[in-house]
Regions:
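Sec-dependent signal peptide recognition
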Residues: 3-10
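C-terminal motif of bacterial Sec signal peptides marking the signal peptidase cleavage site
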Residues: 15-19
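Structured C-terminal subdomain patch of bacterial secreted/periplasmic proteins
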Residues: 25-28, 202-231, 241, 316-393
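Flexible, glycine-rich surface segments
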Residues: 239-328
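A short, structured surface patch at a secondary-structure boundary
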Residues: 68-74, 78-164, 170-176
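Bacterial Sec-exported substrate-binding components of ABC uptake systems
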Residues: 20-113, 224-256, 380-393
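Extracytoplasmic ligand-binding site segments that recognize negatively charged/polar headgroups
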Residues: 103, 110-119, 128-139, 179-182, ...
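Structural recognition of the beta-strand scaffold that forms the well-ordered cores
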Residues: 104-107, 124-129, 170-174, 194-197, ...
Length: 393
């Protein structure tokens, strides 16, 4: 009988900074059980588990001779088999063997593309589920223009003929695939392993970013992945250090929103990662308990009157441009709804807009937190060098 060990991964959302002990600002504790299977095959000897700082939705276990086992929190498992090694004959039936090199990935989870870019593994991506016009990352648009990355259809309507003819060897879906399980099943019937990226379910914003380590394992670029993640973790550390040095400053109240085409206001649920980024950046999200935490949707739509009551006295407004497009001035914002002219942040000029690549640059979450922190600071000199936010005049 095979022996399995259950390790409880308790992730306390706290970052201990050298010399100051400043916590992350998030009172979130998430416990998960991800099974460690020491005996997936008589040919492989279990060695260790990858250390993760924030991510809890996956695990990577190392075995002898360079074999790696990726386990996703939904229960799916993938054995990454080195190029010069054989697939063990007695491998557990639920484990999908994936032989390296993996060179023709169909990447439907668009937020993961920046992770491949950050570890110089775009040569491993052959197909995307986002057409060229939908990309705000110039490098991806250029690769599609050159034909190096091909649009192969959305998550619910992949071009099976194209995928098969071009030799797709791995599919990375986003959570939307759960709405069309028949697509996942059909891809599996063709013998193509399908993994679902669950980064959007991570409790801590940097947990999303830490999925780059999984893709480092998949592509043989673990060192590059660690470096890319550490850069973002260092950005957060700098912000928390600055907050510790300025802890007497009151946290500004912050609203993050956009106006829909029919005049309603879309805001993030309190449990979403953006409000958590605002907290880490030193702000206070205006909604203390908005939305059902059990419902995994990220946002809530409300009428302007309700938003007005909660956000009128907010110290800072951040307009989310990723859905309805960018705005360039406070006048343009107020033109969308005259009630915004009454807002404290509008009258003081503390209104910001996100760049449209904010969502797609998933490997810049630490940098985005740093930008938010700069926007919240009273020192005007710290507001000039932001990349993902710009102040409206």
């Amino acid at each position: 009988m095979k022996k399995r060990i259950y390790i409880v991964l308790v992730v306390v959302m706290m970052l201990e900074l050298a010399g100051c002990g400043k916590d992350s600002g998030l009172d979130v504790e998430e416990a998960k059980q991800i099974q460690v299977d020491e005996e997936i095959s008589t040919d492989l000897v279990y060695e260790s588990r990858m250390e993760l700082e924030y991510a809890t939705e996956y695990a990577v276990d190392y075995y002898s001779d360079g074999y790696d086992l990726i386990t996703i929190s939904d229960g799916s498992r993938f054995l990454i088999v080195p190029e010069d090694k054989e697939v063990p004959e007695d491998l557990d039936e639920d484990i999908k063997a994936v032989q390296q090199p993996i060179d023709n990935i169909y990447l439907v989870a668009s937020a993961a593309m920046d992770m491949f870019r950050s570890i110089e593994a775009l040569d491993k991506v052959k197909f995307t589920g986002t057409d060229q016009d939908g990309w705000y990352l110039p490098q991806i648009s250029q690769l599609m223009e050159q034909g190096d990355i091909i649009y192969a259809g959305k998550y619910n309507a992949p071009d099976y003929e194209l995928i098969l003819s071009e030799g797709c060897d791995f599919v990375i879906e986003n959570m939307m695939i759960n709405h069309t399980p028949e697509v996942k099943e059909k891809l599996g019937n063709f013998g193509i392993p399908v993994m679902i990226d669950r980064a959007s379910y991570e409790e801590h914003p940097l947990g999303r970013c830490e999925w780059v380590k999984l893709y480092g394992v998949l592509t043989g670029r673990e060192e590059q992945a660690k470096t890319a993640f550490d850069e973002q973790a260092a950005e957060l550390e700098r912000v928390l250090t600055d907050e510790e040095q300025n802890k007497t400053q009151q946290a500004p109240a912050v609203a993050f929103f956009y106006l829909t085409s029919n005049g309603a206001v879309n805001v993030r649920k309190t449990s979403d990662y953006v409000p958590k980024m605002i907290e880490l950046a030193g702000g206070k999200y205006i909604f203390d308990n908005l939305g059902d935490a059990q419902n995994k949707s990220s946002s809530v739509t409300m009428q302007m009157e309700e938003f007005y009551a909660s956000a009128k006295d907010a110290d800072c407004l951040i307009y989310n441009s990723t859905i309805e497009g960018q705005i360039t001035s406070i006048d343009e914002l107020v033109a969308k709804n005259q009630l915004l002219a009454d807002f404290k942040a509008v009258q003081s000029g503390n209104v910001w807009c996100t760049t449209q690549n904010m969502y797609q640059e998933s490997m810049s979450i630490g940098s985005m937190i740093a930008d938010m922190h700069a926007a919240f600071m009273t020192d005007a000199s710290q507001k000039d060098d932001t990349r993902y936010l710009f102040q409206l005049n």
